[in-house]
Amino acid sequence: MHVNPEEITALAHAEAVAPRYDIYVLIHKALRAYMVDTLLAVGQLDVDDEAALAQAAQRVTELLAFCRSHLMHENQFIHPAMERHAAGSSQAIAADHVDHERAIDALGAVV
């Protein structure tokens, strides 16, 4: 995740306006919960238990598929809508998504 100090400063000094619905907050909260739940399962894994190992590998594979689907959805629907509203507004996020896709591919290669 990249933090832009100028954006943080602008937010801190922004005038109060009517709150906007944040389309990102709930899905990303759910994604973090899914990732943490999967991490806990992997962390508690007995690697000598072949059935448990297979189940954990399946959980990780399903998580990676969900994350990839989420990225594709944002790239296909959310980013174009952002760009229609404000040109260039999705560029930083699109770059993050490239990094996320590489990480998903790398993790998927070892599961």
Label every model-predicted segment.
Residues M1-V111:
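Small-residue-biased structural context
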